[in-house]
């Protein structure tokens, strides 16, 4: 299948010819996401390369950290690991494959189709937080795993994925042990966004940006205490668990 290139003002996509029409929609989504994030974050990447893959095998071959991460996450989140980001680039499955990956529960299709926006948001967080990737290497990947709740969680919230995650969150709470707070890598790519959703409700979007852009020396505990105005971590954890339960039980 021949590869072609489609461009927009700030993105250049390489993809199979069969995905030509769908990629135009991906670039439109990315331009809208860029415009929104430019209002919130101090720095936005220049032109970003978007590589749209027609199969899981092609994506995994191009981005070998992704299969490693998939083995670490809970089954409820695995279907949403559909791409990767690097310095000046994002790799993602084609929309037709994203739809095939989705389950039949409410919101699953929408979450996967927002994956390009979430990957771009992870790139933006990394550009604004020098201690987070990109670039990736063994040490940076290990740090990403430790802070996935923050980088991936911020991306879920800023891209709009969290608003569609109710059914997937409910499945995760039914099927596995109680999640950690903040969520470990097993749950970060599904539940991380709920931490930012809670913070946005209590402190506003600016607090979410600040949390995403700063890694204090005291680790996650210090980051969360500062974000929630010094509130003891156990109180924030209790509030988050209540928020998680409400999210999972809310009507679509």
Regions found by a protein language model. Name each.
Residues 37-53, 131-138, 169-170, 207-214:
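Surface-exposed patches in mature extracellular/periplasmic domains of secreted proteins
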Residues 27-34, 121, 152, 156, ...:
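Extracytoplasmic/secreted envelope proteins and their assembly/folding machinery
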Residues 17-31, 106-115, 145, 149, ...:
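Soluble non-cytosolic domains of exported or imported proteins
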Residues 178-252:
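Pan-zinc metallopeptidase signature
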Residues 4-22, 100:
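Acidic/histidine-rich, surface-exposed loop or edge segments in extracytoplasmic proteins
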Residues 34-41, 119-120, 124-132, 158-163, ...:
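Sec/Tat-exported extracytoplasmic proteins
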């Amino acid at each position: 299948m021949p590869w072609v290139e489609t461009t927009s003002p700030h993105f250049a996509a390489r993809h199979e010819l069969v995905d030509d029409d769908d990629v135009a929609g991906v670039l439109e989504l990315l331009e809208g996401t860029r415009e929104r994030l430019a209002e919130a974050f101090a720095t936005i990447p220049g032109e970003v390369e978007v590589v749209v893959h027609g199969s899981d095998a092609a994506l995994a071959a191009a981005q070998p950290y992704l299969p490693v991460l998939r083995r670490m996450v809970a089954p409820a989140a695995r279907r949403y690991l559909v791409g990767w980001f690097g310095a000046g680039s994002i790799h993602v499955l084609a929309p037709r494959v994203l739809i095939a990956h989705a389950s039949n529960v409410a919101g699953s299709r929408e979450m996967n189709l927002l994956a390009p926006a979430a990957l771009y948001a992870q790139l933006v967080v990394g550009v604004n937080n020098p201690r987070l990737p990109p670039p990736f290497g063994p040490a940076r990947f290990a740090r990403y795993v430790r802070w996935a709740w923050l980088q991936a969680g911020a991306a879920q919230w800023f891209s709009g994925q969290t608003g569609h995650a109710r059914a997937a969150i409910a499945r995760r709470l039914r099927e596995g042990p109680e999640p950690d707070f903040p969520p470990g890598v097993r749950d970060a790519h599904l539940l991380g966004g709920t931490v930012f959703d809670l913070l946005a409700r209590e402190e506003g979007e600016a607090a979410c940006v600040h949390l995403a852009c700063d890694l204090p020396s005291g680790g996650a505990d210090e980051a969360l205490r500062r974000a929630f105005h010094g509130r003891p971590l156990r109180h924030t954890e209790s509030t988050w668990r209540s928020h998680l339960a409400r999210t999972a039980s809310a009507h679509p």
